[in-house]
Amino acid sequence: MIWYPFTLQFESDPPLKIKRAKGEFLYDENGNSYIDAVSSWWVSIHGHNHPKIIQAVKNQLNKLDHVLLAGFTHDPAEKLASELLKITDGLFHRVLYSDNGSTAVEIMIKLAYQYFQNTGETDRRTFIKFNASYHGDTIGAMSVGGNSVFNRVFQGLMFPTEEFLTPNCSFCPMKKSLTLATWNVWIQLKSFFKKILNPLRES
């Protein structure tokens, strides 16, 4: 009936049926409790059924359930944008909302690409990535992430990128310290940018 994510339908174990949640705990239909160690895929960072969040949602639903931000605006969206911009120390001046991380990555890929198209630098269309990175499961987000068992089958759909080793000493294939691993990645990046930028500088 339901196609659950990251599962093979013909060999997956039945999912655990959850009846309620509170704080960091999930409770199944038999009353057993489980720690939600992944925060339901990183979205319940304040715990489940937090009283302040529940009350804020109730208050908002009594006023306005939803309105698109294309030609419209509303106070909560503007207030949150203002608060977010305060913590950037003036580095940013606009907030673009997204409903999930993968879509946010897709938006930023498009923004970066469109910026250089609009400024006439149409050759600047190569994205770089670290080999062990993860940014989501949409096509663009997988393209700028590392190759894994979850996205390998979709390689033919992804756009080409330049990949560099992640400076992670715990899994460093060159057995280097953090300083040396970071320096090695920097050398790779510098070499790549020199290869890309030199022809532009000479033209």
Question: What annotation goes with each model-predicted range?
Answer:
Residues 1-25, 39, 63:
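Active-site-adjacent loop/helix segments that line or gate small-molecule/cofactor pockets in enzymes
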Residues 6, 33-122, 126-128, 135-136:
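Glycine-rich loop-to-alpha-helix module at the N-terminal edge of alpha/beta enzyme cores
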Residues 14, 22-23, 33, 94, ...:
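A generic secondary-structure signal marking the coil-to-beta-strand transition
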Residues 16-20, 47, 51, 74, ...:
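Electropositive phosphate-/nucleotide-binding environments in soluble metabolic enzymes
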Residues 17-19, 87-90, 119-121, 154-157, ...:
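Solvent-exposed alpha-helices and their adjacent loops that cap or buttress functional pockets
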Residues 23-25, 94, 126, 178:
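Conserved beta-strand and immediately adjacent loop positions that scaffold enzyme active sites
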Residues 28-29:
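Short, acidic, Ser/Thr-enriched surface-loop or helix-capping motifs
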Residues 133-202:
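PLP-dependent aminotransferase-class I/II
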